[in-house]
């Protein structure tokens, strides 16, 4: 859910004050400090990432909620990664086998994206209630029949580490681009939907 789409002027204006993002990294060029809340003006992930599915998901959610409800997102993402990157116990081994660009990207998260997500989610719980977990990942795991179990492990670890219950905090997993839209990884949707 890192966001590859180019951020256009229309994406940076009219963001509702009730839609917030917690900075996952320090971003001096945007005046953002890791662990602090800001109005959710893109980029929501790191200093130079693009538009993410969370951008308009959050905006739409805020529009449909009562005026006294805020929506906050904590977005820790690495575009092009496999779900194994978020397996806290095995991520070091996984990172060691990855290309340099990925190794450099995860440095922004202290070389452990899961740990950073957990750290920020604990901080977010001080300001509100976690109501759901969004996942948009799968292209790099295309064809991996074990993907649902790997995602389940990450989800269950988050629930455990944050003292959450699955009945209260659903996991919402998005599909990848469909075949009729020239999605090269469209076959993964069958696995995502299991």
Tell me the role of every PLM-derived stretch.
Residues 1-194:
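Cell-envelope and extracellular/periplasmic
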């Amino acid at each position: 859910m890192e966001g590859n789409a180019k951020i256009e002027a229309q994406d940076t204006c009219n963001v509702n004050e009730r839609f917030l993002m917690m900075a996952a990294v320090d971003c001096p060029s945007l005046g953002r400090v890791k662990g602090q809340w800001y109005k959710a003006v893109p980029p929501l992930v790191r200093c130079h990432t693009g538009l993410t599915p969370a951008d308009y998901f959050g905006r739409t959610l805020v529009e449909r909620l009562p005026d006294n409800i805020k929506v906050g997102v904590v977005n820790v993402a690495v575009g092009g990664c496999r779900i194994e990157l978020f397996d806290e116990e095995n991520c070091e081994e996984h990172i060691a086998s990855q290309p340099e660009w990925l190794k450099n990207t995860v440095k922004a998260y202290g070389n452990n994206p899961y740990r950073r997500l957990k750290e920020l989610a604990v901080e977010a719980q001080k300001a509100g209630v976690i109501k759901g977990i969004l996942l948009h990942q799968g292209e790099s795991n295309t064809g991996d029949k074990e993907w649902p179990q790997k995602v389940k492990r990450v989800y269950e670890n988050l629930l455990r580490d944050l003292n959450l219950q699955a009945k209260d905090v659903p996991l919402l997993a998005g599909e990848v681009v469909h075949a009729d839209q020239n999605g090269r990884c469209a076959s993964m949707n069958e696995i995502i939907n299991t």
